[in-house]
Amino acid sequence: MEKLFVLVFALTLLAFSSEASPILTEKQAKQLLRSRRQDRPSKPGFPDEPMREYMHHLLALEHRAEEQFLEHWLNPHCKPHCDRNIVQPV
């Protein structure tokens, strides 16, 4: 019983005194939260925020769709169909 107690005490002391402890100080935790994730390469020009990257992607898709729509409606070769002054877009 005494050996078990000594073993548990030694392991506990080792865990709290070593650098391999899973318990972080407040300063280390804040630094870890501030640091960027490096599990995947980050794109140049984008911060490492997946939601912001996704919103930029959606914005680019919306911009491209608007350009294609205007390209169709402002095409001079299909005048009666695409003239906004005569026909309302469907």
Swiss-Prot record:
Region listing for Disordered, in residue ranges: 31-50
Cellular component aspect of the GO annotation: extracellular region
Disulfide bonds: none
Signal peptide: 1-20
Residue intervals passing through the bilayer: none
InterPro entries membership: DUF4543
Source organism, top-level taxon: Eukaryota
Keywords for this protein: Secreted, Signal
Main location class: secreted
Coiled-coil residues: none
Statement: the UniProt record of this protein carries the keyword Signal: yes
Name of the protein this chain belongs to: Uncharacterized protein C17orf67 homolog
